[in-house]
Amino acid sequence: MGHKIHPSGLRLGITQEHRSKWFATSKTYPILLQEDFKIRTFIQKKYGAAGISDVLIARKADQLELELKTARPGVIVGRQGSGIEELRSGIQKTIGDRTRQVRINVVEVERVDADAFLLAEYIAQQLEKRVAFRRTIRMALQRAQRAGVLGLKIQVGGRLNGAEIARTEWTREGRVPLHTLRAEIDYATREANTTYGVLGIKVWVFKGEVLPKEEQTIPVGASPKRKASRRPQQFEDRSNENS
């Protein structure tokens, strides 16, 4: 069933972690679940240009902790952290609680072209600019190969190039072992709104395998001759520690 089930949901607890980490009773669970959905929707709409790959949410007592993985952290942080304060007030307004403590950490995506969501976002932007889908897919494959991914699969469906009959086309480079549970598969979906209709985009990225008795995966595109890449930027919010 590896080709039919969601790759991330199939690997929860093996190679994937939950995007939301908190516990709630049966009464408060739907409320907190709606809050998570509102927060992620708000962040994607307001900071879509920042290239946000994922939003991780954790709750401890009355404190809300967010971790934003983005390709351009400077867009979110702003000058002297002014963007963080604006984001915090926006989240408090979204959930309807101005007194809620919100802690925000912004982490830079180390390999932008090896991230499934950012690749899907790039493909969607090109298709919305009316670039031919075959050329767009080829460019995305080249970018991912330069980033050193072990395998990549891209699927686009809809009225491709304005065709009268909708169809689905896909291409694959390298290995994408969807049946292997220890394989770290990064999966993302995206929609491109074109003049001919909506195109659906799916991206699978194979980053390596989690070996037994090891916590770290095989690094993407690792080579013993190459030096380690620079450490990704991380902006940790410590404004609530003194309060």
Curated annotation (Swiss-Prot):
- The Basic and acidic residues compositionally biased stretches are 233-243
Going by the entry's taxonomy, the superkingdom of the source organism is recorded as: Bacteria
Q: Keyword annotations for this protein?
A: Ribonucleoprotein, Ribosomal protein, RNA-binding, rRNA-binding
Q: List the CDD domains.
A: KH-II_30S_S3 (cd02412)
Question: Which is a Pfam family this sequence falls into?
Answer: Ribosomal_S3_C
According to the UniProt record, where is the region Disordered? 216-243
- Give the KH type-2 domain ranges: 39-110
Question: GO CC annotations?
Answer: cytosolic small ribosomal subunit
The cross-references to SMART domains, in alphabetical order and at most eight, read:
KH
Q: Which GO terms describe its biological process?
A: translation
Quote the subunit structure annotation: Part of the 30S ribosomal subunit. Forms a tight complex with proteins S10 and S14.
Q: Describe the task this protein carries out.
A: Binds the lower part of the 30S subunit head. Binds mRNA in the 70S ribosome, positioning it for translation.
Q: HAMAP family recorded for this chain?
A: Ribosomal_uS3_B
Q: Which family does it belong to?
A: Belongs to the universal ribosomal protein uS3 family.
UniProt-recorded name of the protein? Small ribosomal subunit protein uS3
Protein source organism: Prochlorococcus marinus (strain MIT 9301)
**Species lineage, top-down?**
Bacteria, Bacillati, Cyanobacteriota, Cyanophyceae, Synechococcales
